Regions:
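N-terminal signal peptide c-region/cleavage motif recognized by signal peptidases
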Residues: 13-17
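Short glycine/proline- and aromatic-enriched beta-strand/turn motifs that initiate or cap beta-hairpins
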Residues: 18-89, 251, 257-259
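Transmembrane beta-strands of outer-membrane beta-barrel proteins
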Residues: 23-29, 53, 65-73, 103-105, ...
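Transmembrane beta-strands of outer-membrane beta-barrel pores
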Residues: 31-37, 73-81, 126-134, 166-168, ...
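Extracellular loop and loop/strand-boundary signature of outer-membrane beta-barrel proteins
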Residues: 37-47, 83-98, 141-151, 186-201, ...
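Transmembrane beta-barrel domains of outer membrane proteins
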Residues: 56-60, 106-114, 163-167, 210-214, ...
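Gram-negative (and chloroplast) outer-membrane scaffold detector with strong preference
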Residues: 63-173
């Protein structure tokens, strides 16, 4: 949390001098409710859920020919609860905590269409998201000690969507929605005694949405963001075969920002 607070403070201090020539420069922060699930053969293997926090900045510029270029950079992190089980063949329930810390960046190219005070902006873009997923040591329900481990995830994805905004009295309301497809997914685990192994789950179509309002320079929005992955291929580690199961993440959150 302290790193996110420092990031938010630095963004706020640097924003005024960087705002010249931009239509949008909005540092923001906020809470999210995060859920991570893994499944195999239709059965839920584990569920992680709880609050995490983010701090980031949005930038945007529109040329005289109505070409819109927009970018976002964000850090996020927090600790959530873990409800899962030990690995087969003797699966035993395990409850522990999981720490997340990561970041993401997105770059979009769009075209602005204006009808009176309302604006519509279809866009396409790319994004990168990386994070560490650190499972803490714990004790299973039968008293067995379970060692934690750390996963390092990297995801590259393409985005396609549209955003729109219009005045509503003294408030300007906005909406954004679209789909994204992960074209690269890597999950790296450092197995004791055998080094790092990277699993490559297959990307599945995922979605995102945002509903916001602005009053003066203040911005507030409700956001949803999802990632979907299909099971990876098997990999042998010291004679045992492992794989990354079908996995999904969902985040519902609030962003509060100030546009310079």
């Amino acid at each position: 949390m302290k790193y996110l607070a420092v990031a938010a403070l630095l963004l706020g201090c640097a924003a005024p001098s960087a705002a010249a020539g931009l239509e949008e420069l909005t540092p923001y922060f906020g809470p999210q409710y995060f859920t991570w699930k893994e499944r195999n053969g239709g059965k839920t293997l584990l569920k992680e859920h709880g609050p995490i926090f983010c701090a980031g900045v949005r930038l945007g510029s529109v040329t005289s020919s109505s070409i819109a270029v927009r970018a976002r950079a964000e850090l996020f992190g927090g600790e959530v609860s873990y409800e899962g089980q030990t690995q087969a063949p003797e699966s035993v329930p395990v409850d522990t905590r999981v720490s997340y810390f990561g970041g993401k960046g997105e770059l979009d190219l769009g075209y602005r269409l204006e009808t009176g005070p309302a604006r519509l902006e279809p866009f396409a873009g790319v994004g990168y998201q990386g994070w560490f997923r650190d499972l803490q040591d714990s004790t299973a329900s039968d008293g067995t000690s379970v060692s934690g481990y750390t996963e390092g995830w990297q995801v590259g994805y393409a985005r396609l969507g549209a955003r729109a905004d219009a005045p509503l009295g003294r408030v300007r309301v906005s909406a954004e929605a679209g789909a994204k497809y992960p074209f690269y997914v890597g999950n790296t685990i450092d197995f004791s005694g055998s080094g790092k192994t990277t699993f490559h789950p297959k990307g599945r179509m995922s979605g995102f949405a945002e509903l916001g309002a602005g009053y003066g320079n203040f911005r507030a929005s409700l956001v949803f963001d999802a990632l979907r992955f299909a099971r990876s291929d098997l990999k042998s580690v010291q004679g045992t075969y492992y794989f990354q199961p079908d996995s999904s993440s969902d985040s519902f959150g609030l962003r509060l920002g100030w546009n310079f």
